[in-house]
Swiss-Prot record:
Species in which this protein is naturally found: Vesicomyosocius okutanii subsp. Calyptogena okutanii (strain HA)
Function: One of the primary rRNA binding proteins, it binds directly to 16S rRNA where it nucleates assembly of the body of the 30S subunit.
GO-annotated biological processes: ribosomal small subunit biogenesis; translation
Pfam families listed in its UniProt record: Ribosomal_S4, S4
GO molecular function: rRNA binding; structural constituent of ribosome
Protein name: Small ribosomal subunit protein uS4
UniProt-listed SMART domains: Ribosomal_S4, S4
Length: 208
């Protein structure tokens, strides 16, 4: 299955939630009506109350799209999360948050996770002084993330830094915007992550 490259607004409207797929402080512009279903009759169509299974499936799709994960890879993350001690749902979120592309995005070096994925794939990111071009690379506590010297002047990185400077930096990261370096201080706890994610629905879905 190929990675989705169509309109990001359509995905947000399908899930009825902001998936943070667009750059900027507000990830959706005024043209993207999140509560309106996509399609010709989206404006007049009503979002039906789904079944229990439908709600679980939608939540899984929402989280997959937020982090840009394909179905097969998402299942592998869930399997790994279920094998670890503690809450499977929280373990799953931790694994997703520790992805290198997500950390690059959280540090403000990219405006979106998709953009962060490109930076990693194009060998613009270093971990502990070594180039890493695998977006799914799992970042560990105290790992040092930096932008390669030749990539520092990219306009998209400068724009991302400008935008990130207007928002609150996650407490589990220590970022120096002048040197374009950051430290992954600790794995974020559940209360430090978005509250609108209902990971328990995914656990219920895969537990059947």
């Amino acid at each position: 299955m190929a990675r989705y490259t169509g309109p990001t607004c359509k995905l947000a409207r399908r899930e009825g939630a902001d998936l943070f797929l667009k750059s900027g402080i507000r990830s959706l512009d005024s043209k993207c009506k999140v509560t309106q279903l996509p399609g010709m009759h989206g404006a007049s169509a009503r979002r039906q109350k789904g079944t229990e299974y439908g709600l679980q499936l939608r939540e899984k799709q929402k989280i997959r799209r937020i982090y840009g994960i394909l179905e097969k890879q998402f299942r592998l993350y869930y399997k790994k999360a279920s094998q670890k001690k503690g809450s499977t749902g929280e373990n799953l979120l931790s694994l997703l948050e520790c992805r290198l592309d997500n950390v690059v995005y959280r540090m403000g070096f990219a405006s979106t996770r998709a953009e962060a994925r490109q930076l990693v794939s194009h060998k613009s990111i270093m971990v502990n002084g070594l180039v890493v071009n695998i977006p799914s690379y799992q970042v560990s506590v105290n790992d040092k993330i930096s932008i390669r010297e030749k990539a520092k002047k990219q306009s998209r990185i400068q724009l991302a830094l400008e935008l990130s400077g207007q928002s609150t930096q996650p407490q589990w990261l220590d970022v120096d915007n002048k040197t374009l370096k950051g430290v992954f201080k600790n794995v974020p706890s559940r209360d430090e992550l978005p509250s609108d994610i209902q990971e328990h629905l995914i656990v219920e879905l895969y537990s059947k």
